[in-house]
């Protein structure tokens, strides 16, 4: 249910873009994101910090897109989010005791420290690549192409990378935890 709530605003954004335009879609994205936060609060009595942070960026960049009638703002939001994820992962890798990935998953999964560090760097590089790819597609290809890339390309790549990460984790897990 949680993953559906996270994915729903993106679906709403895509549908409203196809039915109307990027400006109406940006407004719908803001509303759908707010509703997803409210439903998350009602169901789980908590809202994750990452969800609040993402909503803040959606609200800021979506509002700028609508107010200034410039779709570049909503396009930049994607790269900024990926860039901040990259920086957070790299910061944790170099300056914290535990990599961020280990902090997020380490309570449920036991892995050697080197595995956590590799996984952390892999995700940082993945987010960096996605952010750079978004810049290219958003500003050198058509808006329709960017929308399809954002919804299907980036979502598909993230799902694939999550699956590959799961395989990597499974291979390194202690036998008694598999």
Curated annotation (Swiss-Prot):
Compartments reported by the entry: Cell inner membrane
GO CC annotation terms, alphabetical: plasma membrane
Lineage: superkingdom: Bacteria
Residue stretches spanning the membrane: 22-42, 50-70, 76-96, 121-141, 149-169
Entry keyword annotation includes Heme: no
Recorded topology in the membrane: Multi-pass membrane protein
Main location: membrane
Name of a matching Pfam family: IspA
Keywords for this protein: Cell inner membrane, Cell membrane, Membrane, Transmembrane, Transmembrane helix
Function comment: Plays a role in cell envelope biogenesis, maintenance of cell envelope integrity and membrane homeostasis.
Protein family according to the UniProt entry: Belongs to the YciB family.
Protein name: Inner membrane-spanning protein YciB
Native source organism of the sequence: Erwinia tasmaniensis (strain DSM 17950 / CFBP 7177 / CIP 109463 / NCPPB 4357 / Et1/99)
Gene behind the chain: yciB
